[in-house]
Every structure is written in structure tokens, then in C-alpha cells.
Amino acid sequence: TSLPYVNIHCSLTQNIEMPQTDAAYIYLVVEGTLRLYTPAGIMDYESGQYSISAIDTPETGYILAKSDSQRFVAVSVEFNPSDVITILLELDKDLIGRIAGGQQSEQMMDMSDGEVTRSVTRLLEIADDPVKAEFLGRNIRREIIFHLLCGKSGTEFMESIIRLQNSGDIYEANTWIKENYKGAFTVE
């Protein structure tokens, strides 16, 4: 694609290569069924489901079932910690508190998990149009990160990205920054 952080993975063989990157990524199954071997165990993913590498970095993958067209297709979308932290700093402090405390409603988490898939689909739809990809791609990727944070794995995702044992520290830091700094600033 024209978006450097989006990759399409197709495989006709049973074994698949996971993305070789230091960046965090989601790996969304588009066609087929996948089994991932991670440090936490074995996990299966069907079409429309995704894995978050920052939570459980897959070691290997194996195709359990191919689509009717006898292929396996997945999409990976990469992001770095600064992408996620920037979004965390922009979020409402109450929302960050609910994410950090694992207190999102089931309905909100289910909706957000579904929105991740829809947002990735939209990203693919614009990926071949350089004008749309440059502007909209950036915003859709932010949308994906937002929905990952609000989804069922939001707390683990946030903790793994910022590498803190207690995600409450982020909530407190974000609250302090919002209360004490009204102007723009950068974090190095």
C-alpha cells in the first residue's frame, strides 16, 4: 500500500511469517483462520479478529483454515509508543481512568473492538489514493488506536505501550498535565 505502516499479508502455505518490526502492530485476519503461538499460549483468530503485538508478541503463526479461494489474508497496521501516548494525552481524564482501571462497560468495549475492524477496512479503501492516504490515513490510524484503547484489551494495551506496571500512573500524570499546562508543549 502507499501507507508505510500498513502491510497486507497473503499466504498459500500453512506457515506464515509474522511482521518483522520493532513497532507495535495489530494483525487483523481478513480471510481464513490463524493460530498464533505467543509467550502466553496458543490463540486462534478467525476472519475479523485481531491480535495486538504489544500485548502478546506472536512467535509463529500457522494457518488452520484458508478461505474459499484457498488463501489466507491478513493486514497489519503498525504504530509506535508516541502515537499512543499522544492520543492518551488528548483523552478525557475520566475515560483514561476507566481504561486504566478496566472499568469500561462491556457494551463500549464490544463496540470499540468492532470499530477497529471497520477502521482498518476504511484504511485499506483509501490506501491506493495518495492524496486521501496522506491525510485520512493519519486520522484513521489515530481512530484505530483510540478504539484499541477503549476495547477489551485497552488496559493491557496501554500498559504495554507505555511500559508502566501501574497504568494509574498515566492517569495521574495526564490529569496533572491537563490541570497545570494550558498551552501547547512537546515531550521528548
Language model regions located:
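Short glycine/proline- and charge-enriched loop/turn segments
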Residues: 67, 100-101, 155-157
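A short, Lys/Arg-enriched amphipathic alpha-helix from helix-turn-helix/homeodomain DNA-binding modules
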Residues: 110-125, 137-141, 145-149, 157-187
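Aromatic/histidine-rich interaction motifs
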Residues: 89-118
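N-terminal regulatory/effector-sensing and dimerization cores
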Residues: 2-97
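Short, solvent-exposed positions on alpha-helices
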Residues: 43, 131-136
